[in-house]
Amino acid sequence: MSYIQFESGREKDKARQELREAREAMLQQAKERAELRGQRERQKELRGEADWMLPALAKKLEKPAKKSKKNVSKHKSRSKSKSSKKSRKHRNSSSSSESSTSSSSSFSEDEKERKRRKKKSKRSRKESASEDEWVEAPPPLAADNVTKKEPPQRDDWMTSESLLLKTFSRERKEPAKPNEKAQQIDAYDPAKSGRELNPYWKSNGTGLPGFQKPQDDDERQAKPHSSSSAQGSSRGWRKPGAKAPSPPRRSRSRSKSATSSDEEEEEAVQQPKSRPSCLTDEQINELAGKAIKAELKGKKELAAELNQQLEAARKERAEFIASGESVRNANTRPAKSKASAEHVLLTKVDQSGNVRPLVQSGDPNESYGGRMGPKRGSKKVDTHVDGQRVRYFADDDRYDIKQMFEREKHATAAEVNLQYADIVSKHKNPNDDLDDIFADKVRKQISASDAEKREMQSAIREHEKLVATLDNCERCFDSAKLDKQLLVSLGDKIYLSLPWYMGLQSGHCILTTLQHVPCCTQLDEDAWEEISNFRKALTRMFAARRQDVVFYEIANKLHRRPHLSVHCIPIPASQGEMAPFYFKKAIEESEQEWCINKQLVSLRQKSLRAAIPKGLPYVWVHFGMDSGFAHVIEDEDRFPANFAQEILGGMLELNPNAWRKPRKEANPIGKVKSFAENWKKFDCTQN
């Protein structure tokens, strides 16, 4: 006997109404939080705190821009000087050609005078350049003591015009005789000639037909000649009933495209002009100060103009506050998005983290099918001849030993696992063991074009993932998401910044690379050396305050390409002695009992890059510059992301929410300024 359970409709409606009210309340709370967040951001922008940066860093960033401008100006000045020298030479040559035929003696004297002038100018430049050495000029000689030297007279044979060679003559060239045939060709008039076949030359025509006003239905009436000729000439072997397919008419699409382009132009013309940029509080105060100064100095016109600008800025500020936009959206103009083809070098990352370009086949026909490409049938290759093994794989004859070694070395673990899964999944005989499965698969030839296509598709996917991570990275120096008001010091490859949240201790800072690098084992030598210099400076700075320092880095899930970040946390000197024991015990108990790699690696006598192989995930802790520990992460999913923070928090007896749910810093600019004052004396980037 089955019992039917009835439900009341009122209870169902009541539950639905409660669910709707709960959803509306959640949406209202989220909306209020978003509005409050937007108001805070707008207030920061109005105060000028959104783009604030330390003045020392701003100057350092402005220097390369100034250097580039100076180089451009130097290049322009050099090109101008070269052109002026060329023009002078040209003038000298033209003046010498226009001058009359002078004697060789006068020419040689002019040359000597020019050389003397050059020597005098060089001497004067040297004397002006050397400021330390100077000598008083001798007093001018009396006019009586100066004896005038007569110029030397040359012999007659040196100045005789009969012996001189003529370099040019003043005689004009006789004009060439006119060519009779050329005159006849030039004198031909097609309008008067009776042999002219062009009818538009008759009756004083121009040789071209007159202008005819186009009609509106010209495009509809016009038909391509190719279609008419194709319709007229029918094939003899075809049936008479079959008609050739007529091409689709494109007149409507053309007219639509023309009208759409005209509408776009009209919209572009009718768009209102962009509003002037909204000024911040500091800029408005500066403008008001300039206006007051102009009034005090008695410059009435300038004061009136500045007052007008001030009133306009205040009006625009009121409109901006009423509109609810952000300063960046108001100042920036909408950029036109144009889809352009992008050429990218596809790369491949192996197990050790080395990046190599994707190698493609030399034959372009292998990547296409059809007659030019390889046949689809799977050919079997003989591995044994007369009972002796000749080859192991189907492509052994294609590659030599060096190429085979490179292919095996560059292959990744994911490709090997994929190949193994492919072999096992396609095998049908369950009675065969593993050796039989691989022996049958090896005898079949695998298409090289299919393998290359698979590699190219995987490389394209990896490149798309890399572009997405770079766009969303918050630590890359060129990224728009980087909060530059937290920067403290800037080096050649490394920069020092503070976290956006409240750290475990006052003085918590982060060392990061300018470029996107996943971990310290994949760094270049100069970048690693710069990190060690920053660590030494930070250790000295906190030692002056009687504090010890703990540096740590957790390089986990490297396939996601995280950005390198080495955290620096100061701790009291009394608890700094116990920190190595806490971390040693925690690292030994972090993984399972049986591990492939060594559980604890000491860094007292060797560096991190020599202790940990390239490409493996790891955690690294260093206590000042003396000693440290490293550990290779076995299970990446189970390893905690805040491993070092948990140990330090437990050692310092802090609240767990300090690292589990960190709170945002209320006054980041004040924190940056106080840290920068302590960092000035120990800054390693100023040398």
UniProtKB/Swiss-Prot annotation:
GO biological process entries: mRNA splicing, via spliceosome
Modified residues (Phosphoserine): 128, 130
Amino acid composition bias (Basic residues), ranges on this chain: 66-92, 114-125
Pfam families membership: CwfJ_C_1, CwfJ_C_2
This protein's record includes keyword Hydrolase: no
Residue stretches of biased makeup (Basic and acidic residues): 24-50, 146-157, 168-180
A GO CC annotation given for this chain: post-mRNA release spliceosomal complex
Region feature Disordered, mapped onto this chain: 24-281, 355-383
Coiled coil: 6-51, 108-131, 290-325, 444-475
Bias (Low complexity): 93-107
Sequence similarity: Belongs to the CWF19 family.
Name the UniProt record assigns to this protein: CWF19-like protein 2 homolog
Source organism of the structure: Drosophila melanogaster
